[in-house]
Amino acid sequence: MTPSVPADGARLIYLMGASGSGKDTLLRLLRAELRGDEPVLVAHRYITRDSGDTEDALRLTEDEFGRRAALGCFALRWASHGLQYGIGIEIDAWLSCGAAVIINGSRAHLEQAHSRYPALTAVEVTVDPGQLARRLAGRGRESAEQIAQRLARATQPFPVPLQCQLLRVSNDAAPETAAATLLDIARGKLAA
């Protein structure tokens, strides 16, 4: 028997955090800990730049992204740092199959996600500002000016919709600890 998804996205986990907070590392570690029969899925992000080795995303050209957006292929989409990001509508099918689904979202677009999935659980990955600066510098993707902008943005508050459940997971220690916490949250969604 396949459970039907609550239309409100009750098994959706909206992961967010500053650039460099370690979201991609946590998702990679979480995937490695999943049991073969465990219905927890991590959605791919579609992005208009090369995702590199550290990010699990599918690269699209601006034109391809625009075509997919026009066809309604994205459940969620947003622009940030001059790039386009999207989460495919396949997550709706996964939710309807009874899976807990984790998406790598954006703090600035939590309201959009909550509007479509009002029962989602938002999870913010937090990290010490000094450690965040070191991580951003170490990955070599941003200029010094871009790093400064991202550090400033990391400390800015973001709007959290009323009645949106927001959890915070610290990624200051070993990332395996934070990944285990995130996996516990996903497993809790399956049990609810």
From Swiss-Prot:
It is an enzyme of class 2 (transferase). GO terms for biological process: 5-phosphoribose 1-diphosphate biosynthetic process; organic phosphonate metabolic process. Belongs to the ribose 1,5-bisphosphokinase family. Gene3D superfamilies: P-loop containing nucleotide triphosphate hydrolases. Catalyzes the phosphorylation of ribose 1,5-bisphosphate to 5-phospho-D-ribosyl alpha-1-diphosphate (PRPP). Pathway: Metabolic intermediate biosynthesis; 5-phospho-alpha-D-ribose 1-diphosphate biosynthesis; 5-phospho-alpha-D-ribose 1-diphosphate from D-ribose 5-phosphate (route II): step 3/3. The gene is phnN. Its EC number is 2.7.4.23. This is Ribose 1,5-bisphosphate phosphokinase PhnN.
